[in-house]
Amino acid sequence: MVCSSFIRSFIVQAGCRIGVLAQGRHQFIHIKKTLSVGFGFRTSVIGFRTTSGIGFRTSAKMMVDTSAGEKRISLVDMPPEKVDDGGYIGGGWKNDDGSLSCGYCSFRGKRSTMEDFYDIKASTIEGQAVCMFGIFDGHGGSRAAEYLKEHLFNNLMKHPQFLTDTKLALNETYKQTDVAFLESEKDTYRDDGSTASAAVLVGNHLYVANVGDSRTIVSKAGKAIALSDDHKPNRSDERKRIESAGGVIMWAGTWRVGGVLAMSRAFGNRMLKQFVVAEPEIQDLEIDHEAELLVLASDGLWDVVPNEDAVALAQSEEEPEAAARKLTDTAFSRGSADNITCIVVKFRHDKTESPKIETNAMAESEPELNPTTELEPESNPSTALETESIPKAELESEPDAIPDPKPETEPETKGEKAGE
């Protein structure tokens, strides 16, 4: 850690002296001009009620379009954090009709510092309900992750096409916020970086934008489906992209960009910015009656808890905040050496569309059922959980992916933060 920190410090100081951010400053000026354009929205605040012991304070944050004189966004912020005796930060809320509920838990774990941040926001924009959930896992310091918590979703809602073209808005906001962060740090010798895994729900349509190795999964009809793909340097497509830009992938305990950073995309990391971009990969889906829950988490969870286990654990608790706490405790008990932060979002769907089955009709059909097919789920409940995500081992075994030359060293580096 001392060696890598020294290398980063040396590189950052050299980069600051030669003025590598001239282009970034020019882009930032353009961003400021873009974000200063006003748009008037008719808005109302979504009401929430608390579902845990934490008291919730809601405040409306108004952003005013001075050219039109209308209120643009009325935003309900998350309440102040509350820490219990064990050092856990957590709580939860649900909307008025109970169709959506959310719980979160954040824990420093075995690390001496906390570099994980999260953000949860909800609002109504032009009559459209919007909810945003984000996990930001910092490396090399906490400044980048904290900056994303403070600015990413606010910047997103200011984008003129947030509602009409949400994918475009997410893509541009991620890249613009990255440039803005680098500009804000231009006079420092720090080289902080961060992941960002964000789930944005616009009405019933979900968008997941990911940069880095935090992850978002959804449970649909009992299946654990990954909605993001970890950005690792030895991912074949990422390796080709980095090498095409003139970068190198080196082994230093794990595969790293330039021998320094153990992820291929991130916010910040100015001296690797040519290779380590903040352009998100975005997936979207409709939240229908099969969608049961979302889990967003930092790699402190995913290092030791597979997608299928995460869904099973989250489903085992009725309240999402209890599910988030259970996931965090499980990761810690399984040996996670990292900060652990997760958000669980649960959906409740009305079942009115299901036909009512008469008792005598069920009795007549029972002899035709195969009893073995009914007993299978009870004999092994875990078989009901399937996954459509790509296993990490499968990714690394692709023909053009970089093989692990020292697999025996992996247990020693598990939980190690990227770039340290």
Swiss-Prot record:
It is an enzyme of class 3 (hydrolase). It catalyses: O-phospho-L-seryl-[protein] + H2O = L-seryl-[protein] + phosphate; O-phospho-L-threonyl-[protein] + H2O = L-threonyl-[protein] + phosphate. Its cofactor is Mg(2+); Mn(2+). Its EC number is 3.1.3.16. Residues 101-347 form the PPM-type phosphatase domain. Coiled coil: none annotated. Mn(2+) 1 binds at D137, G138. Residues 353-420 are annotated as: Disordered. Transmembrane segments: none annotated. Binds 2 magnesium or manganese ions per subunit. Mn(2+) 2 binds at D137, D299, D338. SUPFAM superfamilies: PP2C-like. Keywords: Hydrolase, Magnesium, Manganese, Metal-binding, Protein phosphatase. GO terms for molecular function: metal ion binding; protein serine/threonine phosphatase activity. Belongs to the PP2C family. This is Probable protein phosphatase 2C 76. It comes from Arabidopsis thaliana.
